[in-house]
């Protein structure tokens, strides 16, 4: 399920999925920012540049994204909360954006399933980037979460095979 809201040029996209995996497994995938290049559409490179010395979770990361010949690298501040099962990333400080925030959350649902929610709020500083985003904007959250679902299936299968 995906929703869109628009306030001026701020684009807000949300997507949710029910998944049959443990919350801790899903959180470990979402908090592993180094793997984003494997499942986030248009993400060509993802690299954690700072970790919290106490928790080991990322606090800063660089992402390189590309679309239609444009390629940009930007850094994000990352907050991983294993108790609340949330991962927040904010790149609003980067010159490319007026705002870019993502919020992943995980919560128990019914029948042994877990709900994963993704919210992406962004506004480009450049009109050109803003116009380009219209081509992919409406599907961005759905495509990211669909990529995440596929990544979870692959990782879960690998873990299951390693346990044998």
UniProtKB/Swiss-Prot annotation:
The keyword Membrane applies. GO terms for biological process: cellular respiration; ubiquinone metabolic process. It is found in: Mitochondrion inner membrane. The keyword Mitochondrion applies. GO terms for molecular function: molecular carrier activity; ubiquinone binding. Pfam families: Polyketide_cyc. Interacts with coenzyme Q. Belongs to the COQ10 family. Required for the function of coenzyme Q in the respiratory chain. May serve as a chaperone or may be involved in the transport of Q6 from its site of synthesis to the catalytic sites of the respiratory complexes. This is Coenzyme Q-binding protein coq10, mitochondrial. It comes from Schizosaccharomyces pombe (strain 972 / ATCC 24843) (Fission yeast).
């Amino acid at each position: 399920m995906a929703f869109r809201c628009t306030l001026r040029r701020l684009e807000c996209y949300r997507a949710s999925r029910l998944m049959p995996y443990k919350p801790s497994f899903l959180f470990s995938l979402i908090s592993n920012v180094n793997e984003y290049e494997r499942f986030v559409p248009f993400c060509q490179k993802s690299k954690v540049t700072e970790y919290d010395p106490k928790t080991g979770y990322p606090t800063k990361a660089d992402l390189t994204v590309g679309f239609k010949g444009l390629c940009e690298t930007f850094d994000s501040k990352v907050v991983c909360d294993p108790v609340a099962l949330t991962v927040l990333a904010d790149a609003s400080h980067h010159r490319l954006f007026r705002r870019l925030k993502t919020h992943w959350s995980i919560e128990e649902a019914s029948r042994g399933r877990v709900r994963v929610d993704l919210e992406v709020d962004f506004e480009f500083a450049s009109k050109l980037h803003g116009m380009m985003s219209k081509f992919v904007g409406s599907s961005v959250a759905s495509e990211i979460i669909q990529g995440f679902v596929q990544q979870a299936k692959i990782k879960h299968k690998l873990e299951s095979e390693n346990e044998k």
